[in-house]
């Protein structure tokens, strides 16, 4: 049962003509390829949040017109009545659980890509986008402005038609209304430029027209970056135009959705802050000024990767917010509110702040939303997965051995346990659960010095929540046994007595420097030597680096740069080389890149991009420019760290697979391999693979993934029977539970 301390979180809150059932608010967030083109995906993704207790559930950004097309990134759309019909399925599903549905109306101005529509962009100025190369817009004159505001009204009416309860005018993150408000963009000399009142005019008039059109039936919200964090003449700050704008249009809105930052450069990361640089509730000093200092009496929602129920209570009681806003925490655990309500705090699957969900949006196109913690996100409709409901396996009378307790093995064991397999034994050769997470979570710690910024280097400790959640789940499952310090050979597996065997033994770094740039060993590389090392050896202290260190980073993500950050903070002279044009480019997609590069520069790390390691000699590394291979440079070093290719630890699996007769004699009817033991990948991939295999352990061949529903247009045929059957099965499982 709910602890009375948290009662305040479950109070209803009025938003204009609507009443939210509680204070949990899923703010607008992207979902990969959901949009309005895949109503099944969209409705079940958002509906799962409502079922999990989120009192308000919103779309992603929702385009109002073809002049605001973000392809290949996927937004929802309300261009016409067909879009409204598709999004009505989402509204109906949210309403099934008594929650409110919100639509975030969006026009990107000159930030729009228009790659699909090919329409000419339109904005407050004729000038280039600071975000996308080659994006220019035509100047919006007075007639254009009236036309654009009409598009907002048309979309708002369609939103009401679809069944939305809350209708946004989205402006935060440098969208069109902010392009008018911010002096960084707005250099106009007419009634829409110059003074604050003129710069605010477009946004104010748009709110007036939307409110007049649908305000009697729908709550009117607007999303504002109270501080663009650009300062001076390049943006605005909370102490000037941020507060002033709230007071200027407060009478027109029913709810304020407050955030910070922009999309210029890496500044979106100041809002969707990665955990290694920004802590929980990191926006408080900015967004907290609005309600706490009485600049509005309207309900306020805000975010900050808030996962701790006690922090939530403090936020409400201090009047920082009226709603606990969440994007990433609601992705990691759609049932977070219900778990608080039912007193199951230890079962909350906390967001780790890795921002793989954000990266899945940046990949664009058909990419589904992905989460390291929650393998079921985005799979609610197409695979029929529910994050809290697991059907008993048809072969549940069988015993299962899971070898390896890294992310894939832990997840597989948890899901198998919840599917009521008779006996699941999880065996791990080390003394702790977690696999590679045991050294990854120690990465990146800096010197503790003040960076001079609002962010600090905090390391990857919060990624340990992947292990923490699964360790708690394993302890609750009586049909799952965990055995640590329990290495196994192929012979041990054959003698163990299990009927199904899952190998999840992870991966290791290549010792010869094999890498993605050359797909071959590097002359002179041998990390078994004392003066050469792999990343885990540095982090765990197995090897002690010398003063001069060169890191060769071929992974393009967090490992190489984190080693550089850690060693530089300890006083080492660090050079990091990468064959890629941008150092750790995937970190741009996770919004960590800007923070990381700032910190590496602060620490004095030398960065060499588009550089390959040609040869390693005692005391020296020879590098070359990838475009001019003959242009080599010799670096004097004491230690070389190779963040190169990884190799699966699949020896036990391959030996067992080569002995089919012995498997049959041992009574092993199924042998499977998952995670990095199958193919090295990211943590999210290992968790997903372990989950999928366990979900499908009773299929004909669990190694061959079952087909999933593909929402698509079929020429000359409209047949929803398969989709409807899938939903019937999902709903039946919910009712049975």
Would you name each region that the model predicts?
Residues 307-309, 331, 487-490, 538-540, ...:
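Short acidic loop-to-helix transition motifs that present clustered carboxylates
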Residues 394-430, 483-494, 504-588, 627-639, ...:
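Rossmann-like dinucleotide/flavin-binding elements
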């Amino acid at each position: 049962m709910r602890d009375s301390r948290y009662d305040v979180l479950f109070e209803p809150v009025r938003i204009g003509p609507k009443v939210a059932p509680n204070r949990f608010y899923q703010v607008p967030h992207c979902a990969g390829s959901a949009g309005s083109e895949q109503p099944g995906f969209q409705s079940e993704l958002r509906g799962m949040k409502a079922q999990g207790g989120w009192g308000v559930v919103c779309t992603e950004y929702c385009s109002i017109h073809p002049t605001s097309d973000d392809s290949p990134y996927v937004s929802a759309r309300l261009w016409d009545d067909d879009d409204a019909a598709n999004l009505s399925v989402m509204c109906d599903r949210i309403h099934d659980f008594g929650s409110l549905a919100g639509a975030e109306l969006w026009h990107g101005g000159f930030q729009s890509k228009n790659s699909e529509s090919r329409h000419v962009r339109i904005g407050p100025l004729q000038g280039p986008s600071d975000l996308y190369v080659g994006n220019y817009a035509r100047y919006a004159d007075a007639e254009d402005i009236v036309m654009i505001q009409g598009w907002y009204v048309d979309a708002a009416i369609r939103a009401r038609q679809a069944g939305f309860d809350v209708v946004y005018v989205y402006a935060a993150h440098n969208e069109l209304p902010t392009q008018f408000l911010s002096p960084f963009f707005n250099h106009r000399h007419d009634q829409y430029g110059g003074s604050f009142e003129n710069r605010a005019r477009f946004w104010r008039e748009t709110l007036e027209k939307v409110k007049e059109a649908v305000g009697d039936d729908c709550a009117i919200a607007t999303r504002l970056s109270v501080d663009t964090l650009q300062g001076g003449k390049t943006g605005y700050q909370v102490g000037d135009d941020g507060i002033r704008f709230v007071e200027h249009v407060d009478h027109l809105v029913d709810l304020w959705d407050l955030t910070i930052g922009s999309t210029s450069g890496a500044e979106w990361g100041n809002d969707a802050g990665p955990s290694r640089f920004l802590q929980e509730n990191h926006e408080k000093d900015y967004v907290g000024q609005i309600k706490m200092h009485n600049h509005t009496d309207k309900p306020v929602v805000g975010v900050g990767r808030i996962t701790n129920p006690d922090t939530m209570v403090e936020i409400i009681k201090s009047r920082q917010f009226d709603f606990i806003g969440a994007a990433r925490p609601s992705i990691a655990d759609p049932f977070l509110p219900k778990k608080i309500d039912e007193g199951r705090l230890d079962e909350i699957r906390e967001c780790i702040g890795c921002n793989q969900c954000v990266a899945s949006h940046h990949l664009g196109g058909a990419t589904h939303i992905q989460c390291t913690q929650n393998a079921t996100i985005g799979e609610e409709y197409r695979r029929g997965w529910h994050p809290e409901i697991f059907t008993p396996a048809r072969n549940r009378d069988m015993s299962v051995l899971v070898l390896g307790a890294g992310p894939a093995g832990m997840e597989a064991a948890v899901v198998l346990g919840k599917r009521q397999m008779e006996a699941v034994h999880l065996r791990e050769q080390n003394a702790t659960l977690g696999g590679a997470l045991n050294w990854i979570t120690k990465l990146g710690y800096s010197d503790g010095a003040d960076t001079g910024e609002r962010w600090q280097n905090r390391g990857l400790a919060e990624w340990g929540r992947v292990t923490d959640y699964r360790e708690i789940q394993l302890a609750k499952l009586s049909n799952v046994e965990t055995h640590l310090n329990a290495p196994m050979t192929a012979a041990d597996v054959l003698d163990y007595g299990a009927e199904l065997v899952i190998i999840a033994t992870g991966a290791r770094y290549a010792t010869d420097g094999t890498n993605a740039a050359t797909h071959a060993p590097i002359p002179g590389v041998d990390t078994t030597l004392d003066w050469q090392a792999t990343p885990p050896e540095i982090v765990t202290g197995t090897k002690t680096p010398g003063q001069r260190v060169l890191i060769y980073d071929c992974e393009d993500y967090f490992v190489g740069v984190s080693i550089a950050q850690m060693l530089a903070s300890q006083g080492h002279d660090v050079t990091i080389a990468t064959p890629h044009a941008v150092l750790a480019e995937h970190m741009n997609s996770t919004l960590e890149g800007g923070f990381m590069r700032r910190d590496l520069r602060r620490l004095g790390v030398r960065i060499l991009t588009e550089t390959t390691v040609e040869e390693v000699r005692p005391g020296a590394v020879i590098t070359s420019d990838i475009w001019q291979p003959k242009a080599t440079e010799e670096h004097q070093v004491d230690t070389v760290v190779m963040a190169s290719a990884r190799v699966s630890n699949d020896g036990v699996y391959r030996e067992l697979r080569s002995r089919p007769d012995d498997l049959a004699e041992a009574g092993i009817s199924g042998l499977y391999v998952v995670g990095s033991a199958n193919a090295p990948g990211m943590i999210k991939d290992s968790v997903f693979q372990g989950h999928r295999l366990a979900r499908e352990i009773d299929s004909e061949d669990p190694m061959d993934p079952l087909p999933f529903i593909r929402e698509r247009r079929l020429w000359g045929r409209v047949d929803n029977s398969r989709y409807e059957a899938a939903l019937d099965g999902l709903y039946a499982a919910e009712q049975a539970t």
